[in-house]
């Protein structure tokens, strides 16, 4: 979780930012995994923003042991467009897997009671989340809670590879997908 400066232009759910935690290392792109206003403010009144960073490469693997609470970071952005509003004429089906769920978490936070806007283009959604092992998935509990409380509704189907539940075009079609 990062505190944002007053100069932050604001972001939309699912955008990304370039973040630099160390001046010796260049900035890296990370998805913003929180909706505007979803995390509130810190004691100094600064808006908060969440990044979800999976330790996949040489750089991200070292972050957990190198970063410290209160450490300054440089955040540039936001960038990109990941719009979950869609069209009233078409049902939305969201498919995500692993850390690729982070932009969807931000979209789901924007659909929570108190944060949800009265945007007429927001439609109910079918969401499919693919995970290697649901029992060990660090994001699944949060995802389930957000989907259960979303306005309008988001129906979540979890595809747990550890239990042989893989998402295929045939599975998607059988579940009422496009």
Where in the sequence are the language-model features?
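Reductase modules of NAD(P)H-dependent flavoproteins
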Residues: 51, 58-67, 71, 118, ...
